[in-house]
Amino acid sequence: MLELVDITYQPETGNKKVLDKVSLKINKNEIILIIGKSGSGKTTLLEIISGLIEHQKGNIVWQNKLVNSRQRRWLCGMVFQFPERYFLGSTIGKELKFGYKSIKESKIKNVLNKVGLSNINLTSPPEQLSGGQQRRLAVAIQLLRSPNFLLLDEPTAGLDWSMKNDVKDLINNISSENTIIVVTHEPELFEEVTSKKFVLIEGKLIQWRKDLER
């Protein structure tokens, strides 16, 4: 279990706390949904969990031990909003192998099969994939790292409805083997596979209730 205890974050240039004593328990194979208005701190929370930025107060505990930002970067795989903007390889194959001295072809094949890309041409550029396929590729890149937690920031942003459903099906397909945290403005897409849903309001993380929609 990963546990966040009273996490507080305030940007150096701001005078308001983006996150104020946020606590959250994430159990193995759960899918956690986090919603909230734009600018409410959802992406910031993912970046703290994944070790990309450091919080000022509070603790993050993994298997009853405090974990620092460097350790969390190993624990977590994060797929940013519009991940296709960050592709660096000239081909899909090079994109998948980027950063590895060596990686088994069997592992790549297995991960591509999990995300529904088993039939793609690895010599093609990533730009030739559809929007939904590019999101699947971004997830595959993170799954190759075998992370304990997969963090998805607005995974359906900018996609048409059919591609949104493509991403929903992907999350559904990998949910049995992965612990996933999804930040989204479209919670209705993922509610059938969600374990818990939270909303960020004025820096506070609150377990979702029906009356919070008002």
PLM segments and residue spans:
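ABC-family nucleotide-binding domains
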Residues: D160
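Conserved ABC ATPase "signature" region
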Residues: E105-I120
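Conserved H-loop
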Residues: N178-T184
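Helix-to-loop junction immediately C-terminal to a conserved catalytic motif
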Residues: S50
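Conserved ABC transporter NBD signature motif
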Residues: G58-W74, L117
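Conserved ABC ATPase signature
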Residues: P125-L129, Q133
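Catalytic Walker B motif of ABC-type/P-loop ATPase nucleotide-binding domains
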Residues: L150-E154
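ABC ATPase C-loop
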Residues: Q142-L143
